[in-house]
Amino acid sequence: EGEAITRLGPRHYNDTVNGRTTYPVVADPSDILLNQAWVRFKPAQQVETIVGRQAVNFDNQRWVDSANWRQNDQTLDAVRVAIKPVAGVSLDYGYAWRVNRALGPRSPQGIWRENDIHLLRGSANTKPIGTITAYGYFFNIPDAPLSSSKTVGLRLVGEQKMSGNAKLLYAAEYANQRDFGTNPRTYSLDYLAFEPGVSVGVVTTKIGWEKLEGNGAVALQTPLGALHAFNGWADKFVNTPAAGLRDLYVDVSIKLPAVAGIKGASTRLKWHDFNASRGSINYGREWDAMLAVPIIRGLTASLIYAEYRAESFGSDFFTSLRFSNNFIVPITPAEKMTFFAWTVWVCLKREVESRNVISYRASDF
């Protein structure tokens, strides 16, 4: 899977590598990338192995995610084995040696190389309670030593039918994170999350509480997780403050009826109250809103608004409009091979240039 990112309008923004630091950040630098290239081996229905550059998403993507809302996905050069020994039970193990981040290879922090990353996860559907997942994520990242950590946790998610078309929803999670590998700091910090909710017809309402603990010097972090999806769309808390973070939020999703022949539109409203987990500091509040409307097959327009009102952390923030698409274009096998060969050549050339060497080592790809 290859991807090409380019701008259509003026370069009046900071893409993190163009040097325009006086402009707002839009972290989508132009580039041509080999986004995914992997081989799958499935000797039996219950066992699957994937080797190569791949997108990895676990559970709600809090800890491991491909950041696919950005123009450039986050992928791992990894080996992953998935086993389903019996119905309702799954076991996963992954080993990754390279992280290809959403910032792109031209960014100083766009690629984390020579890592020692272990991903362990097991889940079981325990009807009628729900799905229980245990996990252990061990990150040793020499290029970003403060992101090296080991996180062990337990997650429960489920739903119960109520009268009519109503459902009770619930999720709860606990994890402990400690220093690991090249991290020079010593710490042990907890993560807690509770999210009860109710779904009635086309309306789903959730009230959640999430805590990422901090001790005043260091805080729990999620370097490979979905940063944008949590703690507000204004992205003020992609890095947890040293005093930690408590996020109390309300999340309402509504599937809209068909209008003028347009089906599948939806809207979402969120409210957040952010506080430190240590002490009584109030960081601020945030309103988020989204309207998503399918235009044609494979193309959706999303109007997204985020308003963060600062009390003692960050500054006020507003955001705007984006389009998302998932086009499926029929092409011939010869065209597929031509496109693949061209993409591989361009990406290998970029890889060599990013290393400032004259030869490419396949073992590093």
Residue ranges, per PLM feature:
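Signature for the C-terminal beta-barrel architecture of outer-membrane proteins
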Residues: Q45-T49, A67-A217, L248-V250, K255, ...
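Cationic, low-complexity basic patches in intrinsically disordered or flexible, solvent-exposed regions
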Residues: R350, S354
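C-terminal functional modules
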Residues: G244, A276-Y283, M290-E311, S320-I331
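Surface-exposed loop and membrane-interface regions of Gram-negative outer-membrane beta-barrel proteins
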Residues: E1-W38, P43-Q45, V56-R70, G104-R106, ...
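Extracellular/periplasm-exposed beta-strand and loop segments of Gram-negative cell-envelope proteins
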Residues: Y13-D15, Y23-P29, G158-Q160, Y174, ...
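Outer-membrane beta-barrel biogenesis signature
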Residues: P241-R246, S253-A265, I328-M337
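Flexible internal linker/loop segments at domain or repeat junctions
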Residues: A219-G244
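Outer-membrane beta-barrel "beta-signal"
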Residues: V250, S315-L348, I358-R361, F365
